[in-house]
């Protein structure tokens, strides 16, 4: 009899667990520091004329977690993205200096290399990337079909 009482509650328990998982939004912009947007004004104490007014970022920041002590492995975009997404020093990849250019070429992140995205997906998150990639792009194979890992991407549409 007690079991019959608890069975109808199971969906509510499952859904309450799902909603407890936080949403994660990671912003990364080239040449942007913590003091450049108003989202960190509470921390930097910069005056309004010293930063870009970003009300949407401010709202997201007020609802989430902010990092105030982050460091980059490089002053360049490609190695910084590689380090952030893989957790590895960028010089451990095949590219030892500078950045990757163009939209074709083999990806700098190996197909079997764990990334933030694979970690989040393993925990049931849906992942997406918008904007500059700069880590090597091999969207299509020579037969015109999407390359492994890009099957659900439609790269012909405007963002």
Which role does the model predict for each range below?
Residues 15-159:
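Formylglycine-dependent sulfatase
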Residues 1-20:
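Bacterial Sec-dependent N-terminal signal peptides
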């Amino acid at each position: 009899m007690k079991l019959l009482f608890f069975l109808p509650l199971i969906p509510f328990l499952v859904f309450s667990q799902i909603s407890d998982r936080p949403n994660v939004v990671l912003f990364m912009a080239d040449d942007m520091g913590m003091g450049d947007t108003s989202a960190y004004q509470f921390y930097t104490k910069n005056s309004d004329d010293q930063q870009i007014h970003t009300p949407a970022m401010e709202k997201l920041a007020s609802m989430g977690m902010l990092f105030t002590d982050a460091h980059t492995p490089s002053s360049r975009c490609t190695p910084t993205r590689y380090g952030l997404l893989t957790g590895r020093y960028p010089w451990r990849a095949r590219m030892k200096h500078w950045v990757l250019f163009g939209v074709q070429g083999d990806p700098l992140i190996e197909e079997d290399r764990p990334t933030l995205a694979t970690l989040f997906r393993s925990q049931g998150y849906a992942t997406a990337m918008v904007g500059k990639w700069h880590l090597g792009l091999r969207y299509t194979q020579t037969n015109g079909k999407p390359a492994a890992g890009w099957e659900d991407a439609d790269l012909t549409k405007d963002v």
